[in-house]
Amino acid sequence: MAAPGSGAPCAELCRQLLLTLVVFSFACEACKKEIFNIPSKLEADKMIGRVNLKECLGSVDRIQSSDPDFRVLEDGSVYTAHAVVLSDEKRSFTIWLSDTEKRTQKEILVLLEYQKKVLKKRHTKETVLRRSKRRWAPIPCSMQENSLGPFPLFLQQVQSDAAQNYTIFYSISGRGVDKEPLNLFFIERDTGNLYCTQPVDREEYDVFDLIAYASTADGYSADFPLPLPIRVEDENDNHPIFTEAVYNFEVPESSRVGTTVGVVCATDRDEPDTMHTRLKYSILEQTPRSPGLFSVHPSTGVITTVSHYLDREVADKYSLIMKVQDMDGQFFGLMSTATCIITVKDSNDNLPTFRQNAYEASVEENTVNVEILRIPVEDKDLINTANWRANFTILKGNENGHFKITTDKATNEGVLSVVKPLDYEESHQVVLEIGVANEAPFTRDVALRMTTMNRAVVTVHVKDQDEGPECSPEVQYIRIKENSAVGSKISGYKAYDPETKSSSGLRYKILHDPKEWITVNEGSGSLETYKTLDREVITPKNDLYNITVLAIDQDGRSCTGTLAVSIEDVNDNPPEILQDYLVICKGNMDYVDISAIDHDSSINGAPFYFSLANTSPEINRLWTITRVNDTAARLAYQKNAQFQEYFIPVAVKDRAGLSATKTLRVNLCDCTNPVQCRAARRSADVILGKWAILAILLGIALLFSILLTLVCGIVSARNKKAFPDDLAQQNLIISNTEAPGDDKVCSANGFMTQTVNNANQGFCGTMGSGVKNGGQESIEMVKGGQQTLESCRGAGHHHTLDSCRGGTIEVENSRYTYSEWQNFTQPRLGEKLHLCNQDEEHMPSQDYVLTYNYEGRGSPAGSVGCCSEKQEEDGLDFLNNLEAKFAALAKTCTKR
């Protein structure tokens, strides 16, 4: 009985101890007290200040206010829940902070004060507390943005330790005092009380860095200047604003859930990283009002799809009214709206469909490039896009390629055409299966749940037509050997009537034969060689010689076919060495390569076999030839070969045994003077082409034409009068005499002529000269010799005929005979000689020296003789009776 009695008090004690521990664990620990200066009247949702919650309790999951007139946000901002009027100068409430995980609770006492302007008098020196260790230090200070006053609003008091010993006067400077904005702050000179004169906008000025000064009455600085920062506490006075009034986005229809449509963004001018700038996005309204298709992330503003039923054919555009609100979206936060236009882009989610499942068409046989049917389709996708345009395909029935189907871009219809003639005898009708799809591929979801191509059947009826002969196959092949004898028979081209399947009654003609080697039998179509076939003359395509044949029926209808003649090669062309002239520089080159070609086919061509085709022991001793490859050989010389030009015959043989020999001109040169080697090579390589030969012939023809012209001119000149009238014919006569003549007495003997046929002898003739006023005569008697006229004086005219040297003298044939010529000239010459002698006898002697100008060299001609003795006055009587127009000239020429 004792044990239970004693155990009961022990259990009670344990329960009391546990209860005490629980109470102590939840006991509230007080944090730093907060004091706010506020006006006596406050509006609802008005911020009065901010407390530092994290400084009091690191992790807070529950915040409560003891006064229902005030609420506290997560960042410590204290707001009025509704309008508040302070009846007393002071009012307080408690903020409880709880951390349920750590079972910790703390409280913050908030003291609200309403103070009128208090002008504190400066303490007297006796009443000032003396704290010798206190220093002049900055005092933390802040003020509420857009404060309601009363103004001037007391902020704090500034005091210096020097005030214990001196009378101190206070002053401030900085932005808000003597810098813009001016006169926003002032300090009482005696007390150090700092005041603000008007509300401040934090978005314009977030802090004021003032400097406080303490000085004595005589201006002595009692302490160092004190930095005095005044921070402006933010108030939620700015609405969040979207960056754009209207957003435009696009999204493909049938998009998957979660597809990003776009991003909206808003900004808030309030203090960053506070509840005033913590924004939340939401959708207020969607138009058209269909089930919700879009959502927006509350923090990032990303708009996404929440349904895959976006269908452009139902609605191609949606309008969303977007809302953004600060204070983390709480109902008392500030908000603004914007419009978001979302356009649904078309995707290929609708298949083109045929209006009916079966179609029929008809066409006559042998008709091509005709349209036989138009097939319409329907598609709900956006018109004139790749999602709407149809792409038709013939799936079955067009194995022979008779049909083609295209799309009419304007109507989106399928156009079925015949591109290859149909044959009624082969098939009376053709059944086609037509498929249709879009140009753009189908969306994945559509492709998974339905077929991607619709089908329809088209039956084409072929109409019979009376047709002409048919050349089938179009290309027929035959073989014939090269160099076949003229008149060799060849099986010809065969056409037939498709109705009777017979070739009777058809006529054949050759439309095109490149070399006119073949003739055709018009009735049977058999061929016959007209000329010898030479495979190497032409360059056959694919080793075929094509002949175009025309087959004609009795009604004049025709068809055209090709007869491909395969000409079998015959080894009728020996190999040909390409080189003619070769230069080998001895010492630098030990050999030279030569090559050959064969115009025959490969079976009669390479490999070639080269050898020396000379029985001369010297050539065989000095030169060797070896194989390089199938078409080339190497010609080498021995070391003891001399510098000279060698003529080396080389034989080359093809694989079939046909050979040819060519003599190569090889110049073994020391190349010390390469020009000589090259010159020899150039002379050896000169080959006249057809144009050069033509130019030579034209030159020869031109030369003959010039010679013919000269001959004609000479003949015409000989037909003229041999001895013209003794007049100058109003032309100047060149005497080629510039020096004085010899003094000679002209003989009056008769004229004497002599003809000498010997080419080695000369001819001498003497001619008398008479006087004829105003004229000069010259007689040319000799062709091919040289004539010299000696001078005779006679009335200022001189006529001389000297000897003729070296040449055959010929007397021109003319219409005058010799006797006529003598009768014509002898009296006149005798008269002239007589007058010349008389003038010489009556001429006074001139024994004085005559002056002649030096002209650089002596004249090869003789003296002008009696002509130089002519008096100046002779024959000048006409100058005495000059007309008036010559008076000035006469005056100029008269000696003075």
From Swiss-Prot:
The protein, known as: Desmocollin-3
Tissue spec. comment: Expressed in stratified epithelia only, such as the epidermis, tongue, esophagus and rumen (at protein level).
Glycosylation site residues: 165, 391, 546, 629
GO biological process: cell-cell adhesion; homophilic cell adhesion via plasma membrane adhesion molecules
Record's subcellular location: Cell membrane; Cell junction, Desmosome; Cytoplasm
PROSITE patterns: CADHERIN_1, CADHERIN_2
Lineage summary: Eukaryota, Metazoa, Chordata, Craniata, Vertebrata
GO molecular function: calcium ion binding
Keywords from the UniProt entry: Calcium, Cell adhesion, Cell junction, Cell membrane, Cleavage on pair of basic residues, Cytoplasm, Glycoprotein, Membrane, Metal-binding, Repeat, Signal, Transmembrane, Transmembrane helix
Domain notes: Calcium may be bound by the cadherin-like repeats. Three calcium ions are usually bound at the interface of each cadherin domain and rigidify the connections, imparting a strong curvature to the full-length ectodomain.
Main location: membrane
Propeptide cleavage-removed residue intervals: 27-134
Pfam families referenced in this protein's UniProt entry, alphabetically: CADH_Y-type_LIR, Cadherin, Cadherin_pro
